[in-house]
From Swiss-Prot:
Subcellular location: Secreted, Extracellular space, Extracellular matrix, Basement membrane
The protein's name in its UniProt record: Laminin subunit beta-1
Main localization (coarse): secreted
Domain Laminin N-terminal residues, every copy: 1-202
Listed GO CC annotations: basement membrane; extracellular space; laminin complex; laminin-1 complex; laminin-10 complex; laminin-2 complex; laminin-8 complex; perinuclear region of cytoplasm
Chain positions carrying an annotated carbohydrate: 52, 288
């Protein structure tokens, strides 16, 4: 830190941070916001001199992600990007690029202004070398400048839905001495360090739940944790209420839309079966009123 007399410390992150026993531990869990009075005593710190560094959050279920606020102990990155995955890390899409010099760091990427809420641009507002500490990088998934006509549309829902969030730092800010002297000891003066990383969102239930519980196998005692197992209603089931309950396949599964619950509907098998499946051809043939087909009919019945 430029304002401190002593500039070099030996870090030991083998054990978690402790105010007195291990104050020089800088593990990634230190970025979890506590809002405690001593929050500036702990931070995450990257390896010295390394420019390409990644922080990845792997969530236990689908979530609605709304915004990210990162508070840095060091200079903010000269270049970075935020990415998302909605299929547990199989594929990734860029949310936004950030750079002091967008054209140099991310050539070919528009610098805006945004024309649509899902435009991918490079933002220069959060990449200045000043302040040298406690500078923020802020990202909102839905820019308040855009009026969202239908928040339940697939386009908006897909923008919000994540299972993984990845922040890639690609360029360090330096004071220029590394350009005159390429020795490792010069480069090692620079690194990324973060006090807080606030990730805001809520459990993702397609409108079929109003509360969430802990996912099986995950701790429920983490303070402030948003749980990922939806307490499903409207005859739905699954971690995210993404399926109809068994024997509720008379209508296709749909997400709720505003005041319309789009609840799954029970099949009508006249008491001769407890199993059914949805058939789109049957649904369309009935004028989109009933698509449930009874399976394993009993009592000498069929159809």
């Amino acid at each position: 830190h430029l304002q401190e007399d002593k500039k070099c410390f030996i870090c030991d992150s083998e054990d978690p941070f402790h105010d007195t026993l291990n104050p020089d531990s800088h593990r990634i869990e230190n970025v979890v916001t506590t809002f405690a009075p001593n929050r500036l005593k702990l931070w995450w710190q990257s390896e010295n001199g390394l420019e390409n560094v990644t922080i990845q959050l792997n969530l236990e279920a689908e979530f609605h992600f709304t915004h990210l606020i990162m508070t840095f102990k060091t200079f903010r990155p000269a270049a970075m990007l935020i990415e998302r995955s909605s299929d547990f890390g199989k594929t990734w899409q860029v949310y936004r690029y950030f750079a002091y010099d967008c054209e140099s760091s991310f050539p070919g990427i528009s610098t805006g202004p945004m024309k649509k809420v899902d435009d991918i641009i490079c933002d220069s507002r959060y990449s200045d070398i000043e302040p040298s500490t406690e500078g923020e990088v802020i990202y909102r998934v839905l820019d308040p400048a855009f009026r969202i006509e239908d928040p339940y549309s697939p386009r908006i829902q897909n923008l919000l839905k994540i299972t993984n969030l990845r922040v890639k730092f690609t360029k360090l800010h330096t004071l220029g001495d590394n350009l005159l002297d390429s020795r490792m000891e010069i480069r090692e003066k620079y690194y990324y360090a973060i006090y807080d990383m606030v990730v805001r969102g809520n459990c993702f239930c397609y409108g079929h739940a109003s509360e969430c519980a802990p996912v099986e196998g995950f701790s429920e005692e983490v303070e402030g944790m948003v749980h990922g197992h939806c307490m499903c209603r409207h005859n739905t089931k699954g971690l995210n209420c993404e399926q109809c309950l068994d024997f509720y396949h008379d209508l296709p599964w749909r997400p709720a839309e505003g005041r319309n619950s789009n609840a799954c509907k029970k099949c009508n098998c006249n008491g001769h079966s407890t199993q059914c499946h949805f058939d789109m051809a049957v649904y369309m043939a009935t004028g989109n009123t009933s698509g449930g087909v009874c399976d394993d009919c009993q009592h000498n019945t069929g159809g």
